[in-house]
Amino acid sequence: MKITKIKVENFRLLKDFSIDVENKLSLIIGKNNTGKTSLLAVIEKFLTEKSNFSIHDFNLDEQEKLKALEKKEGISIPEDFKFSIYLLFEIKYDDTDNLRNLSSLILNLESENTVVLGFEYYLNPIQFKYLIDDFVEFKSE
């Protein structure tokens, strides 16, 4: 079993990011402030108990989208407004892998296949209230 692709949307510097993971070795190399740490941070936030997202975790474009909703008397949220962070793993497996942890996700019995695991952090109306409070604090900084 092997992760072959990682995709991230709307997390810090990673607006629409994907990386193909090589068979032997994959290196994440780049200049400062290009998203290397953000990639590891989003994986950690979704896969560990450190899943405390804040306004600062959302991509700057998403923060601007939220800021555009601001009115003089508060923030008005349209019903179709989507505010989320997304992480996706593509995992290839074959008949030699132990599939116990993935068996409920497998839809066919072919020997070579791919399973896609997606994680999404999105805000429901109650969470929007907390986000608005964070946003007011963010705006005052």
Language-model regions: role of each:
Residues 1-48, 59-69:
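Pre-Walker A-like glycine/lysine-rich segment at the N-terminus of P-loop NTPase domains
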Residues 57-88, 92-141:
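Glycine-rich phosphate-binding loops of NTPases
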Residues 53-55:
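Internal alpha/beta loop-helix hairpins
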